[in-house]
């Protein structure tokens, strides 16, 4: 997605080896026009799979996932990292390790929100090692539902997450694929391939 690549190139910042900061448009301050375009692109990519729900993990995945759900005309389910007092029903849960934050979180979804009739599209902001996506896959499987695809805004293609998910048979669509963040330079996958 050209518009996203341009935004990453202009406003993304490599803050450490393997860490890309995009908080000016994706996960701290959000560019609503870009999120709308991202939602449209995910809807175009996945509408044939007929998802009945979009699932994301709080909090950075919410903006692109909401726009994708809106464009697809389906509800958005947000997996929580902490169980709020208002979540009184039984839950589906999975453990997810964050390499960025160096911590393990239990993600939870209230059982009434997913069931075996659902066709779930997973959307997330980043894909690095694949742990967040695999945690969401586990939650969907616990519900007896089907994962119809995984949409990623930015994939760190130099890490194993994309290969891991694709090797398990998931259709993964990444709108931007980063080949390298070495030496503080953002290199897109297409640049390396050509």
UniProtKB/Swiss-Prot annotation:
- Pathway annotation: Purine metabolism; XMP biosynthesis via salvage pathway; XMP from xanthine: step 1/1
An MF annotation (GO) of this entry: xanthine phosphoribosyltransferase activity
Residues engaged in binding xanthine = 20, 27, 156
Q: Name one GO cellular component term.
A: cytoplasm
Query: Coiled-coil stretches, from where to where?
Result: none
> Which keywords appear in this protein's UniProt record, sorted alphabetically?
Cytoplasm, Glycosyltransferase, Purine salvage, Transferase
A biological process term (GO) from this entry: purine ribonucleoside salvage
Where does it live in the cell?
Cytoplasm
Q: List the SUPFAM superfamilies hit by this protein, alphabetically.
A: PRTase-like (SSF53271)
Describe the family membership recorded for this protein in Swiss-Prot or TrEMBL: Belongs to the purine/pyrimidine phosphoribosyltransferase family. Xpt subfamily.
Outline what the protein does.
Answer: Converts the preformed base xanthine, a product of nucleic acid breakdown, to xanthosine 5'-monophosphate (XMP), so it can be reused for RNA or DNA synthesis.
**HAMAP family per the UniProt record, alphabetical:** XPRTase
Question: What is the name of the protein in this document?
Answer: Xanthine phosphoribosyltransferase
Q: Which organism is it from?
A: Geobacillus thermodenitrificans (strain NG80-2)
Q: Its gene? A: xpt
